[in-house]
């Protein structure tokens, strides 16, 4: 092959292996890194052709026969079921709590599933290595171990839509087929996958958008920033597993310092050298465990990253070009796998897999020996077993059957399940090392419900009362203990029931225990619903009182009626008519109007002023329908016509004081209806009202000059009356107009109110209860002196029929009934007060087994007295037994406990000495006499010579810090909540945690339950107090210490004597990065200058954030290069918050770039001014985007109005440094070919490149090329000297750049 290379590429190696996916990857990577894109794609094409050629010759197919289920499965399932039955027995004996049982079941099935998976692989490997499924899955062609496991192993445990694990596993696989239950549980988990995929695609897209926005202006702008800092790289480890080996992390990095071999001190690699695959491999092989490299995190370039700090462009395996937009590449690299992560859950169909703990299994049958000096602490495992936690690391002795000694190392924190000299079987779990960080735990509660009814009994249960913030009393169990439910039948009785039994009485089956009565409060006439059978009547009505009008009939008013709303008229025998204001079926209350008299006697023709003359009104009973008139008198009415207009005064066609005739135009299209004098009411040149006052003008005489006496009413018998030359009562007021003032004499219309009676003949249904009556009443509708604004007439007074109720029963309401008379369409009015009584068939609770009998004690139309019993309900005993207790639980209920024959069991002990005493609690499986085992749990009630009587019961173990819902001696029914257990559980670790967790880290959110962080570095001492609280003390080298008190609930992840670093977590949970930054900064600022302290504190948090993001992606087997995350994290940690501006122009609370504030402070030092004080801050990606220097970029991201307004107020300038700003205003972006921000690229650099060309290039220049050689790509192109005269060329470029700048 004739090639034009600056270096001789390595010769291809012969790979004598099965070429599976992994090997193919290696081959392609080799071709790409040595020969560039073009040749690598050519090779890929050739391999594809080769693959297809053979695919047509032979292929693999899947058949049912290939799905081989390992024969050990049946045995494994049998073993697991036995273990689960054992756990259930423990639970029934009250040895473990319901939570521990659940946890044990889940772990047991999970381990069984894992074991079966290993069996499947082993079975294929040993018996059928050419099995098509095995070949496909393990060559990497299609499928993975998880899917194979579901096909031929067992589907295992599934999670429900809330992410909680269902404790019923799917034991079958797809080869055997699923049962209906299996299928439904399966669909449950799979549906979750589908929904999640749909939702998370959007989440992932939004994450990418935010990342692009935060990093879009990071461009490679210079070659070397000459930084004096680097970061330390070593293997990335989590849970004792190497996630990313050092070799992979070094690839494409630039060294910060020259590396020497640890053995020979030879130079392995030079400072500023970029590391390729071979060098990285060589460094690791030479035994170097950690290397300091250049990193975007420590780059000193302002608002960019330099070539050396960034390292390789991973797309072509060589140093990144100037002008490369690395920010966008970083954002896409982190955002893109988000969509893949979403697909992960979907394919496994929600199958739960979790490496819950690393188990240590016994290598053989044997015995364990524990030394005397052994330091352990007794704990209760999550399965409710007692075990020891090792406080230090130990090597323990295990002896096999031939007494040969073997040593096994147990690390600190290991849980040991065996005691000294205890025997164990091969592959038995003897210890467990919990994986502390990867599992996300959450605090949850679970209700403990009783499975049978009976009496609550506390056994060794210590309780304490607490008052919570709301003032409620809470009973909780600080230590835990046992709670027994001693069985018996519980009956719930309402407090009003009449109990017919006494304690210790024997009751027969179907005997009446209690009776509840339905009583009528008022008495009256009984009405039963005819259609109902007496056996199941649910309600009956009692007519307490009823009144009817005998001398009036109701007819339908056809003129006013509509289909939906009929109108009725009440006609009296004397000819008076009333309009009905209520319909049949309406409910009316005291003083409510029934009907209104049809009458025009008190109607006016216009508006006016109302005056009362000689009568009183009832002020108390004011309602919407006016005031009730007491006595006789007259209403005086002074008519006037009021027009309410809202118009400009210039539009008015009349003026103040003008006398007009009827029909005069006041404003356009508005005419007066009466004649009179005009009064105008205006406000701010706007006419509100025009009033036309009828009357005549009267020139005031000299004698009457008292202006305060007007307006007034003058009657004909008044001494001054003659002066006014009028007829009838008059109303005098002043009149103002242009010429001057005069008096206006207005006519007064008098409406007489006489005391005429309306004769109502009322008839009462019962002789005793006359609670209600119908009475007529007159009401005046306006107040004394009120102005009625109207141009049309109004009614001044109305006569109503109202319902009146006895003053001692004001709450009664009556039903309106129209009772048909003898003729059609004619009705009589009845008002009836009804008492509706509910007759509940289930007065004693819902329970099916409780039998009740209800009987009626009255007949239809029977007249009963107040307080009479209407119906009775009897509660019958379900089975015969003794009344154990009658328990008044609260004001409303009372509970009765009856012990039946089935609740007590007798056990023959055949003259043996009993090993128990009366009152003891025993559990099933306990020995009660020599050779006699109790089959049921319960309490010993009686011991006779030959018999022991046991009252059966169920024990429930209550864990510590549970909240009790019952008290000792309470009676409970099946399904009642006994206690709320508080516990920690691990969430399933699928990507449901992935994306939100990445978002949480990158948005720098405070975790919900953050872990406690150490305030100083030092040595830990752990103590436990009596309350089971843990006291942690961290002692530093200078003798100072910090103390932390932890409650029993918080899980501690450090151990005694351990050395801890600054800001390391002490308890379980995710650390709060803001707190971490604060701790580091406060610690460093006491020991070094402010700038250095801020830089170092930020660097610590940066490295933590990078590792956290990597952890999440690695848990899903997604590889992302560190440098991409570093670029994003650099943007999150570039700002500081000003605390005190000193003599600078900065304000407290302002966010400034760290480098910028340091430059300002340096200037202050020179001018002897006071420098600014600040503290570093961690901003989430959204906040960083909004706080960027460019307001155009920030506004195009979120909160456009706010950003632009603030920028305008502050008078900001946008320097257009990033890509986004330039795109928005339509300029060339400053990346790639548009990169012209820096023109001081050293000329010698280009010369150097030219001089590096080897002679082989000159020789090969004129030789012919093969067809395969006309493949040019970036990697090769950069090695060609495409510039004939580099110096002249460079000058031309420089001129062009300068010209474009001038333009």
From Swiss-Prot:
Catalytic function, reaction form: RNA(n) + a ribonucleoside 5'-triphosphate = RNA(n+1) + diphosphate
CDD domains associated with the record: RNAP_beta'_C
Protein's UniProt name: DNA-directed RNA polymerase subunit beta''
Cell location: Plastid, Chloroplast
A GO term, aspect molecular function: zinc ion binding
EC category name: transferase
Cofactor details (free text): Binds 1 Zn(2+) ion per subunit.
Keywords attached to this entry: Chloroplast, DNA-directed RNA polymerase, Metal-binding, Nucleotidyltransferase, Plastid, Transcription, Transferase, Zinc
Organism: Rhodomonas salina (Cryptomonas salina)
NCBIfam families: rpoC2_cyan
GO biological process per UniProt: DNA-templated transcription
Binding site for Zn(2+): 225, 299, 306, 309
Recorded GO CC terms: chloroplast; DNA-directed RNA polymerase complex; mitochondrion
Record text on subunit structure and interactions: In plastids the minimal PEP RNA polymerase catalytic core is composed of four subunits: alpha, beta, beta', and beta''. When a (nuclear-encoded) sigma factor is associated with the core the holoenzyme is formed, which can initiate transcription.
Highest taxon above the source species: Eukaryota
EC number: 2.7.7.6
Role, per record: DNA-dependent RNA polymerase catalyzes the transcription of DNA into RNA using the four ribonucleoside triphosphates as substrates.
Cofactor(s) required for function per UniProt: Zn(2+)
Family, similarity comment: Belongs to the RNA polymerase beta' chain family. RpoC2 subfamily.
């Amino acid at each position: 092959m004739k090639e034009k290379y600056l270096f001789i590429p390595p010769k291809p190696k012969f790979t004598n292996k099965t070429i599976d996916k992994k090997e193919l990857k290696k081959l392609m990577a080799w071709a790409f890194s040595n020969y560039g894109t073009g040749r690598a794609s050519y090779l890929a094409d050739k391999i594809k052709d080769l693959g297809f050629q053979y695919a047509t010759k032979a292929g693999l197919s899947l058949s049912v026969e290939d799905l081989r289920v390992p024969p050990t499965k049946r045995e494994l399932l049998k073993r697991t079921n036995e273990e689960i039955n054992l756990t259930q027995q423990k639970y029934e004996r009250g040895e473990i709590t319901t939570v521990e049982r659940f946890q044990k079941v889940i772990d047991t099935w999970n381990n069984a599933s894992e074991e079966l998976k290993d069996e499947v692989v082993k079975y294929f490997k040993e018996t059928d290595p050419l099995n098509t499924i095995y070949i496909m899955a393990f060559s990497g062609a299609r499928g993975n171990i998880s899917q194979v496991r579901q096909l031929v192993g067992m589907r295992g445990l599934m999670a429900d839509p809330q992410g909680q694990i269902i404790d019923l596993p799917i034991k079958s696989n797809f080869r055997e087929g699923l049962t209906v239950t299996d299928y439904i549980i399966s669909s449950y988990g799979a549906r979750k996958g589908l929904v999640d995929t749909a939702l998370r695609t959007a989440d992932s897209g939004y994450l990418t958008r935010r990342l692009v926005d935060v990093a879009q202006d990071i461009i490679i702008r210079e070659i070397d920033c000459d930084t004096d800092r680097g970061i330390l790289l070593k293997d990335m480890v989590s849970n004792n597993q190497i996630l990313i080996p050092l070799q992979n992390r070094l690839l494409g990095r630039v060294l910060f310092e020259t590396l020497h071999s640890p053995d020979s001190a030879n130079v392995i690699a030079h400072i500023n050298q970029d590391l390729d695959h071979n060098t990285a491999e060589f460094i690791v092989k030479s035994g170097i465990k950690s290397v300091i490299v250049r990193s975007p995190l420590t780059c000193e370039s302002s608002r960019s990253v330099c070539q050396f700090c960034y390292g390789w462009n991973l797309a072509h395996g060589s140093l990144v070009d100037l002008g490369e937009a690395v920010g966008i590449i970083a954002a896409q690299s982190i955002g893109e796998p988000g969509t893949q992560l979403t697909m992960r859950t979907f394919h496994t169909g929600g199958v739960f897999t979790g490496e819950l703990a690393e188990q240590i299994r016994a290598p053989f049958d044997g015995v364990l020996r524990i030394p005397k000096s052994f330091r352990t602490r007794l704990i209760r495992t999550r399965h409710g077993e007692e075990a020891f936690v090792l406080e230090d690391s130990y090597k323990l002795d295990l002896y096999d059957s031939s007494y040969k000694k073997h040593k096994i190392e147990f690390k600190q924190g290991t849980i040991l399940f065996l005691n000294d000299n205890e025997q164990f079987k091969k592959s038995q779990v003897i210890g467990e090392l919990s994986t502390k960080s990867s599992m996300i735990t959450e605090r949850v509660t679970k209700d403990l419900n009783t499975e049978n009814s009976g009496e609550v009994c506390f056994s060794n249960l210590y309780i304490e009362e607490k008052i919570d913030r709301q003032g409620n009393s809470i009973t909780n169990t600080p230590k835990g203990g046992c709670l027994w439910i001693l069985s018996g039948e519980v009956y719930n009785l309402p407090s009003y029931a009449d109990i017919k039994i006494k304690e210790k009485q024997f009751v027969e089956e179907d005997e009446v225990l209690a009776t509840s009565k339905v009583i009528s409060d008022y008495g009256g006439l009984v009405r039963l619903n005819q259609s109902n059978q007496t056996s199941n009547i649910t309600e009956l009505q009692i007519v307490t009182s009823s009144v009817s009008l005998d001398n009036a009939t109701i007819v339908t008013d056809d003129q006013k009626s509509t289909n939906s709303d009929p109108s009725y008229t009440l006609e009296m025998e004397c000819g008076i008519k009333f309009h009905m204001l209520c319909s049949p079926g309406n409910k009316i209350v005291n003083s409510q109007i029934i009907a209104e008299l049809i009458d025009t006697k008190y109607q006016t023709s216009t508006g006016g002023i109302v005056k009362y003359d000689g009568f009183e009104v009832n002020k108390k009973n004011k309602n919407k329908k006016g005031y009730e008139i007491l006595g006789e008198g007259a209403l005086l009415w002074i008519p006037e016509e009021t027009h309410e207009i809202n118009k400009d005064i210039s539009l008015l066609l009349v003026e103040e004081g003008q006398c007009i005739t009827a029909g005069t135009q006041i404003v356009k299209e508005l005419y007066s209806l009466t004649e009179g004098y005009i009064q105008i009411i205006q406000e701010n040149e706007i006419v509100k009202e025009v009033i036309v006052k009828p009357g005549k003008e009267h020139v005031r005489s000299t004698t009457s000059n008292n202006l305060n006496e007007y307006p007034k009413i003058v009657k004909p018998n008044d001494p001054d009356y003659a002066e006014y030359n009028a007829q009838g009562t008059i109303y005098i007021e002043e009149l103002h107009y242009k010429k001057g003032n005069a008096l206006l004499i207005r006519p007064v219309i008098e409406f007489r109110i006489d005391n005429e009676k309306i004769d109502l003949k009322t008839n009462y249904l019962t002789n005793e209860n006359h609670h209600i009556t119908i009475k007529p009443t007159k009401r005046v509708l306006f107040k004394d002196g009120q102005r009625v604004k109207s141009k049309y007439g109004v009614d001044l007074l109305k006569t109503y029929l109202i319902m009146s109720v006895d003053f001692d029963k004001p709450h009664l309401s009556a039903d309106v009934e129209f009772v048909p008379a003898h003729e059609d369409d004619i009705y009589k009015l009845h008002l009836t007060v009804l008492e509706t009584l509910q007759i509940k068939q289930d007065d004693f609770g819902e329970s099916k087994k409780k039998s009740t009998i209800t009987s009626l004690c009255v007949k239809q139309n029977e007249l009963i007295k107040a307080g009479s019993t209407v119906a009775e309900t009897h509660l019958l005993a379900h089975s015969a037994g003794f009344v154990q207790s009658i328990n008044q639980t609260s004001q409303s209920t009372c509970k009765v406990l009856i012990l039946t024959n089935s609740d007590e069991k007798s056990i023959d002990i055949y003259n043996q000495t009993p090993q128990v005493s009366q009152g003891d609690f025993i559990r099933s499986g306990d020995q009660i006499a020599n050779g006699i085992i109790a089959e049921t749990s319960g309490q010993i009630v009686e011991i006779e010579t030959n018999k022991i009587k046991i009252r059966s019961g169920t024990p429930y173990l209550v864990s510590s810090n549970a909240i009790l819902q019952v008290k000792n001696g309470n009676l409970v029914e099946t399904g009642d909540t006994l206690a709320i257990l508080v516990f920690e559980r691990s969430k399933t670790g699928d990507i449901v945690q992935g994306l939100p967790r990445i978002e949480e880290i990158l948005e720098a959110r405070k975790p919900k339950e953050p872990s406690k962080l150490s305030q100083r570095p030092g040595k830990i001492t752990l103590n436990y107090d009596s309350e089971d609280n843990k006291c942690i003390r961290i002692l530093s080298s200078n003798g100072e210490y910090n103390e932390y008190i932890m409650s029993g609930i918080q899980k501690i992840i450090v151990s005694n004597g351990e050395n801890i670093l600054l800001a390391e977590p002490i308890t379980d949970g995710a650390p709060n990065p803001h707190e971490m930054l604060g701790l580091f900064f406060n610690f460093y600022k006491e020991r070094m200058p402010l700038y250095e302290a801020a830089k170092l504190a930020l660097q610590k948090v940066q490295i933590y954030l990078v590792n956290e993001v990597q952890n999440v992606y690695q848990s899903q087997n997604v590889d992302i290069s560190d440098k991409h995350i570093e670029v994003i994290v650099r943007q999150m940690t570039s700002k500081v918050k000003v605390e005190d501006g000193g003599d600078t122009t900065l304000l407290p609370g302002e966010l400034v770039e760290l480098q910028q504030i340091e430059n300002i402070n340096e200037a202050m030092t020179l001018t002897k001014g006071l420098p600014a004080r600040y503290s570093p801050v961690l901003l989430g990606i959204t906040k960083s985007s909004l706080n960027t220097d460019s307001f155009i970029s920030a506004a195009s991201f979120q909160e456009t109005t706010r950003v632009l307004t603030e920028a305008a107020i502050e008078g900001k300038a946008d320097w257009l440094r990033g890509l986004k700003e330039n795109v928005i205003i339509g300029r060339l972006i400053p990346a790639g070919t548009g990169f012209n921000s820096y023109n001081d690229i050293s000329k010698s650099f280009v010369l150097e490149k030219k001089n590096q060309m080897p002679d082989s290039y000159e020789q090969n220049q004129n030789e012919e090329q093969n067809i395969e050689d006309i493949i040019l790509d970036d990697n090769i192109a950069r090695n060609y000297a495409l510039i004939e005269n580099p110096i002249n060329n460079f000058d031309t470029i420089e001129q062009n750049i300068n010209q474009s700048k001038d333009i």
